[in-house]
Amino acid sequence: MHLRLVCFGVFECQTGCMLRLGLTGGIGAGKSTVAKVLTELGGVLVDSDVLAREVVEPGTPGLQQLTDTFGTDILAPDGSLDRPALAAKAFGDEESRKKLNAIVHPLVGARTAEIIDGAASDAVVVQDIPLLVEGSMGPFFHLVVIVWVDAEERVRRLTGQRGMPEADARARIAAQATDDARRAAADVWIDNTGAPGSVDDDVRALWNDRLIPFERNIREGVIARVHPEQVTADPAWELQARRIVSRLALACSDKAVRIDHIGSTAVPGLDAKDVIDIQITVRGLDDADSVAEQLRVAGFPRREDADFDHPKPAYGIGGEADPAVWSKRFHGSADPGRPANVHIRVDGWPNQTFALLFRDWLRADDSIRTEYSGIKRRASEAAAGITDFASAIEAYENAKAPWFDVAYRRAWQWAEETNWTA
């Protein structure tokens, strides 16, 4: 819960432009090394561990609250907090631990908010949170950076550099998130196994090639775009989509009826453009408009000129040619490292339903998947060599359109035959 308080502080105080990066990693992985480089490059560092110590220094209201709750025997002779003495009292039972959290964590959250409020509107805020993964805090940040070192190397560092007993080192590592959990949360994975300084160039490249353009895109309302060319299916697309969905869910709150990974990247084994497609289902377009600013702040600005899908002919099964019910809102990711299209459609309208149907049809039918792959390959060839992005997309979509007009009817026939439901 304390991590949520810290993160809510970040979101309540920020101006709507700054980029928020969550930095974490297992004990002994060296995330402080990465934080140092990011700070040298201009990042605004918010270190949760440092703040947790700061808010209970001598003379602070935090320390006074601790002594009022746990007694003056938690103080050292010089008046500072005796942390082992506090731990002996606060971690002996669940009720005491809750009392400790209720004192310290809101103070850390408030101090975090102060730091963020003092940052420039175009800042890159780096929030160092040791238990970010364990606290499921990824959606609160535009990006999560994981610093990784394998467990044995971390044990060696903890025992050799910090003098920690091996049993304690292994116990602390075992109590933290697994590597699989960290990989699922990581937008950026930094392997810090090498010698000191070996990751510095990687961190600088991250800053220059992704963080700075990402922040600028958010501030200027620019969507990251890629040319419509097919790439080999990437198993990582599914985890990437899950992280995007989590961020969108946080931004939309109860305005979203459901949020789904759609399109070719949602079909395992299907080659596709390296762009994640997500559909947010809403009750009405007024709801879509009401969350436009939250989505921009979350890193998904709106594209004003893409507010409809092309109606499909009414062949008697699922078809509806009325343009009004093919309206939508379109947002896109500002992250140059993970382009994404975000389609906001109304629950039950034909474009909303077909997006789900088409995905499931492709997943279920190998022959259709192969057929569609060929169509996309030819569409990419039609767009190849066209340097203007809008023109390339138009050529790509026009090449697919005739097939889709027929596929719409075929998909709905499959839906009736299989009793498909969204």
Which residues are covered by each model-predicted region?
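Metal-dependent nucleotidyltransferase catalytic core
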Residues: R156, G160-R172, W207, F214, ...
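Active-site nucleotide-donor binding segment shared across nucleotidyl transfer reactions
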Residues: G25, I129-V133, V245-S290
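Small-molecule kinase domains that catalyze NTP-dependent phosphoryl transfer to phosphate-bearing small molecules
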Residues: R111-T112, P139-F140, G160-L211
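ATP-dependent NMP and nucleoside kinases share a basic, alpha-helical "lid"
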Residues: A113-G118, V124-G160
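Walker A/P-loop
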Residues: S32
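Catalytic cores of NTP-dependent nucleotidyl/adenyl transfer enzymes across multiple folds
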Residues: N341-A422
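Helical scaffold of the NTase/Pol beta-like nucleotidyltransferase catalytic core
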Residues: M18-L21, A110, V199, R204-D260
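ATP-dependent small-molecule kinase phosphotransfer cores
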Residues: R53-V124
